[in-house]
Design a protein with these regions (language model features):
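A charged, aromatic-enriched C-terminal amphipathic alpha-helix characteristic of glycosyltransferases
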Residues: 126, 140-176
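Short hydrophobic beta-strand element within catalytic cores of glycosyltransferases
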Residues: 102-106
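Conserved catalytic-core segment of nucleotide-activated headgroup transferases in glycan assembly
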Residues: 1-67
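Acidic donor-binding loop of glycosyltransferase active sites
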Residues: 72-88
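Acidic, amphipathic alpha-helical patches
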Residues: 67-70, 131
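Nucleotide-sugar-dependent
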Residues: 83-93, 107, 112-115
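Short alpha-helix at the nucleotide-sugar/activated-sugar donor binding site of glycosyltransferases
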Residues: 96-98
């Protein structure tokens, strides 16, 4: 079975850096970092155009998934590439890390390091060479089941709504 590489692909949302992501994937393939004999390439998002990756193959595309389909897919991902030119991490990197995947994302403004959530989240500067190097690191981590699982076990991503909303509920119940 092949490992699963997922790219969060939203070309009509410029903040998602779709075309940089395509360059990163192609460069990683050209440099034999991302070996298509070992990795299945999947694009997930909306309005994904017909594209071919470096070797002329078309990626598998999933568009407009409902939440159940998205959650089911997230649980099968080994490595994700999710770019977002915003100061917040966005949902896909956190969703994928919470599902056990390793994720490469970009730095921006105050978003420099996401280890506070998970050691399976790798941040790199939003430029080709830095992101390709992060893909290299991501592949090494995604294919190391012991390190990847240990990072997942040590995730600081809360799955308990009561815990997550505890402070908010406290403030609201005290002030209102």
């Amino acid at each position: 079975t092949k490992y699963r590489f997922v790219f969060y692909a939203r070309p009509n949302n410029l903040r998602n850096l779709f075309y940089l992501g395509i360059q990163v994937i192609n460069s990683a393939i050209q440099q034999q970092i991302l070996n298509l004999d070992q990795w299945e390439i999947i694009f997930v998002g909306k309005d994904i155009p017909d594209v071919t990756i470096d070797d002329g193959k078309e990626p598998i595309k999933y568009q407009n998934l409902n939440w159940s389909e998205y959650a089911q897919l997230a649980g099968t991902v080994d490595l994700g590439l999710s770019l977002m030119c915003t100061p917040h991490p966005s949902y896909p990197p956190l969703d994928l890390a919470a599902s056990g995947a390793v994720v490469v994302t970009n730095r921006f403004s105050n978003k420099q390091d996401l280890n506070c959530y998970s050691a399976n989240l790798i941040c790199a500067d939003p430029e080709l060479h830095a992101l390709v190097d992060a893909i290299r690191k991501g592949i090494a981590l995604a294919t190391d089941p012991v390190a990847r699982e240990q990072n997942f076990i040590n995730n600081k991503l809360s799955t308990d709504w009561n815990q997550s909303l505890k402070d908010v509920i406290q403030v609201l119940s005290t002030n209102y």
